[in-house]
Amino acid sequence: MPTINQLLRKKSSRQAPKLKSKKPALAGCPQKRGVCFRVYTRTPKKPNSALRKVAKIRLCNGIVVIASIPGEGHNLQEHSVVCIRGGRVKDLPGVKYKVVRGRLDLQGVVNRKQSRSLYGTPKSK
């Protein structure tokens, strides 16, 4: 246990460590715009089995990221302009971002009744 004099002498040594960002490509922003240059499927890690839809996106700050496309069905192609947000997919290594549905070139999920705001679906009449 240090004495009070030792603490006063070394003020800087007892600072909390700086936390590394989990979403460095967003650069502190809630969302970022980017252009798709590859849309493809990936298989998840071990106990799960599926073909998860992902897109490789070049952001407006020049960083290239892989983002998941949530929901059933999508209309993304090469050169589509999309908006991405943070949020990883637990069974896809390296996928730390999600595409925002219903914004820019990506349409919302069709016939979605619950959790519509997450999937960009307008209210049905």
From Swiss-Prot:
Residues 1-26 are annotated as: Disordered. GO terms for cellular component: mitochondrion; small ribosomal subunit. GO terms for biological process: translation. It is found in: Mitochondrion. One of its GO terms (molecular function) is structural constituent of ribosome. PROSITE patterns: RIBOSOMAL_S12 (PS00055). It comes from the Eukaryota. Keywords: Mitochondrion, Ribonucleoprotein, Ribosomal protein. It holds the Pfam family Ribosom_S12_S23. Residues 8-23 have a biased composition (Basic residues). Belongs to the universal ribosomal protein uS12 family. This is Small ribosomal subunit protein uS12m. It comes from Prototheca wickerhamii. The lineage of its organism: Eukaryota, Viridiplantae, Chlorophyta, core chlorophytes, Trebouxiophyceae. The gene is RPS12.
